[in-house]
Amino acid sequence: MRKFINEITITGDLVKSELEEKTITTKEGKEIEVITGSIYLRTADKSEFEVRLYTNKFKKDSSEETYFYKKYAKFMEDMISIETAVEGQVPSVVTASGCEIRPNDYKSKNTGDVISSTVINGRFLEIESQKAAEMVSKEASFTIEGIIGKIEDEMDKNKNLTGNKTVVLYPIRQKTEDFTNENAYEVDEIYEYECVIEQDLLAAFDSVGYYEGCFVELTGKMVNTVEVKTEVIEQAFGSPIEKKKTTIVKKNVIKSGSVPSTIYDVELTDELVEALKQRRVKKLEEIKLDVGNKKQNNNAFGKVAAPTQQAPVNPNVGYNPFAPKN
């Protein structure tokens, strides 16, 4: 099976860096040196994004330093963040590329509910030159493949229609033992990635014929900012009172998409998708019940075998693996 597209690129001002070099102990009890932590980037619209990074210092069973260790160590040496900049210093403009969205599920300490979100795992870091920093677009973009699970009208918190549509995409996390072979991947986990298609592209979006259950590639912009609204309240006498309301605006805005295809076109089957769904349900239940180690239970249904059945000659294009079962 080929590798599904899952690409995040972020360019922005470096707000702060929490990268550090440290020694950790593996599950096997072996101590290894690593660079780990997060950086925070601010885009032109004042959105801020956390990018998580990790690399071993040495190659396996070798004293040779890894490529990413050298790159991250150099980054830590050269970077200037908004948090640490002194007078006369200009904070670094950084591009994080080759990043991926990953599922992040945890149990709330306050409510006990399972919260499902996504995190950004980074790979390549580049500090833009002064000349490039003046010209580069500071933005966060995504290109992700997955199964469309739901398309519906978007509503605000007061249940009012916004005029946009919500598109729930289900990307599939994969794994491989051979990263040099783009066709040696197998499915591992399915998760939710909510997007929005805004009014100006609705007609074009609807004309493509997307349906719940089709496999697509979506490209767009990521927003994660704070919106402050001021409400002026008139009083019976004296000066009016101003109340400020702060709202976090987090959305993934679709800007383009591929021609829809079926799951069978990418070597998926109904049984394979159903197994991924059940594995997902079981994982969330185990987090809720604090059952064992999440990582150990991540493969509760065993290895998902590669599909062996042939795709139907005339597959039902209306097939939706996420629809409720009767």
Which residues make up each language-model segment?
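OB-fold and OB-like single-stranded nucleic-acid-recognition modules
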Residues: 1-326
